A protein has these predicted regions:
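A short beta-strand-to-loop transition that corresponds to the Sensor-1 phosphate-sensing loop
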Residues: 99, 168-169, 203-228
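P-loop NTPase motor core
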Residues: 11, 27, 61-125
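Short secondary-structure boundary/capping segments
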Residues: 59, 111-113, 179-185, 217, ...
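Conserved P-loop NTPase "ATPase switch" module shared by AAA+ and STAND
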Residues: 159-189
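Amphipathic alpha-helical segments of the small helical/lid subdomains adjacent to P-loop NTPase cores
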Residues: 219-226, 233-303
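Substrate-engagement module of ASCE P-loop NTPases
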Residues: 151-158, 185-210
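Short glycine-rich substrate-engagement loop in P-loop NTPases that contacts/grips substrate
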Residues: 133-153
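Walker A/P-loop-proximal flanking segment of P-loop NTPase domains
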Residues: 1-63, 67, 72-81
Length: 303
């Protein structure tokens, strides 16, 4: 077995770690120019364990101005390394994962605000060179996540600093509320003056680009009447294989591990794929792609 064989990144959602630790990465960077040609605020829905988090981590690494100097290290061997886009390394990134927001309904708004505060403080530490000392002092003194968001919005608008918002698991805690607390409680946080709907209103004019993922369109429909500018690409055929693995990507992976001795040299790759297909390969997210593209494998199950 080749000692330099790339390890499979099972359960790892950190793109930088995958690349820097020489783990196997299925290149999805060819979708970046397609995404840039879409409207600037995107919603993308896929089932759980389909590679959403590592895809967002890749977006973060690519567009983050604080990582601009690492472009060749992280992306040099990938498609976009040879075809960089105009927006590479342009943005300050606020990356949120709402699966970290939890607790009982009586604490949900408080926990959400606390999570937002922690993430915004981390944001300011990364990009502090762009902000004056008096603003940073006011920002860090505030103990409210929504107040910090408002302060940041005013300051970045004044300075014309471009921001990119990435949200993973946007519907995580709202789906839990709907399932466990019922429609009335769910309605209270996602409609009218509900805190979750309200924060989406704040996002509306603040970020130059937004990319949001989750597993269900239910919350999307409820909060975006306040947001009112999202572009839903989940069923567009050109993005059908953006997450998960295509048959060709699985074939390429098996060929690599066969070559380096990770699987027996006598392995029949096509037979392996045929055996997997009934279990892991029956996903198609676009009606227009149903007869023109191969079905998509669940990436977590393949790995």
């Amino acid at each position: 077995m080749n000692q330099n064989m790339k390890r499979l990144p099972y359960g790892i959602n950190d793109f930088e770690a995958v690349i820097e630790q020489n783990q196997y990465y299925v290149d999805k960077t060819m979708y970046l120019p397609l995404l840039e040609n879409q409207p600037s605020n995107i919603f993308f829905i896929r089932p759980r364990r389909f590679g959403k988090s590592i895809f967002l981590s890749m977006l973060h690494a690519y567009y983050d101005c604080s990582k601009k100097e690492k472009f060749q290290t992280l992306f040099g061997d990938l498609w976009v390394g040879k075809h960089p886009t105009p927006l590479q390394g342009k943005y300050q990134i606020l990356h949120l994962d709402f699966s970290y927001v939890g607790g009982g309904i009586e604490k949900l708004e408080e926990n959400f605000n606390m999570y937002l505060r922690v993430k915004l403080d981390g944001f300011m530490r990364v990009y502090q060179e762009f902000y004056l000392a008096d603003f940073k002092e006011r920002f860090f003194k505030s103990d409210s996540g929504t107040e910090k968001l408002a302060l940041l919005q005013d300051e970045t608008a004044t300075k014309n600093l471009p921001l990119y918002l990435i949200i993973d698991e946007y519907d995580n805690f709202t789906n839990t509320v709907l399932n466990e607390q019922g429609e009335n409680v769910y309605w209270a946080i996602t409609h009218a003056d509900g805190f979750y709907r309200d924060v989406f209103k704040k996002f509306k004019g603040m970020f130059e680009r937004i990319f949001i993922t989750g597993v269900s369109p239910v919350t999307l429909d409820d909060v975006t009447s306040g947001f009112n500018i999202g572009w839903h690409i989940s069923t567009k055929p050109e993005f059908n294989q953006m997450l998960g693995f295509s048959m060709e990507e699985v074939r390429k992976m098996f060929a690599y591990y066969k070559e380096v001795g990770g699987i027996p040299a006598a392995s029949d790759i096509e037979a392996m794929i045929d055996e997997m297909k009934p279990w892991y390969d029956n996903y198609c997210f676009s009606e227009d792609a149903l007869h023109t593209q191969s079905k998509v494998f669940n990436s977590d199950m393949v790995i």
